[in-house]
């Protein structure tokens, strides 16, 4: 351990070559299961604080430093050290810089920091205006990066897919959910409406994060009406299309069904990831919390889609959730009924990011 203590001391050496070698040699010790991971706790987390400073270093050193920070931030104690405003502003300045080569790695770091409830204070933070956004609010700029920056549309080095997990974690907490369900002044759009379109995106990261976001905000029963409003967000087609397969449906089944769900091609594929598929069906279950929601889903023929899913998916957990949804849709309605929703907290997004 004494040799390691000496090595971490070189992270703040005056010679940049020494700093570079030090961070390179320390990278293996950033793995959360490494038996000597505790070296990062040395002297009141001094090595972690050195890594924070190295983000302002030469690009090659900064790249190694942010990689190390992504890994060590899997630890809750380390995350507390990284949550100061000055460091968060530094990370955001990297993420929002269209020319910065470390934007995606920095988004990975934000994924881990977003596990902290205190991360919601970024809703009050601002950064300089960028040409891709009309807002100084950091959360608005992150949203614009996620929506406009896919497929390297803003930064040739980044696609911002990891922001989906950041947003998913934020919606675990009330303040985060409020942002994503509230009309924003700078563009007069509800953020959630920008995200639902990614339920069939090619990126597994995006689909996973967006599915979790939609599920989490669906716990807000008053907002469910906005979610299902066909003149507004109209979330149902975005939930159902990934669940639909190529099976031929009868005219009766399709009567009232969304146009985009009718007459699907023979090569139509369902969502391949079972975790995402289960999340989408669980969200539909949440949306049956009100009679209005249930009747809307009946009119729009949700049942035939779920029936075919149940018949064609080989996953018992998904089939069980399908059964729950079907029971809500086919049951008789009482004249007056006390509406309720499952007393479960929004999803705990347990995805911790690590760089190999």
Swiss-Prot record:
GO terms for biological process: chaperone-mediated protein folding. GO terms for molecular function: protein folding chaperone. Transmembrane segments: none annotated. Gene3D superfamilies: Leucine-rich Repeat Variant. Pfam families: DUF383 (PF04063), DUF384 (PF04064). GO terms for cellular component: cytoplasm; nucleus. Belongs to the HGH1 family. This is Protein HGH1 homolog. The gene is hgh1.
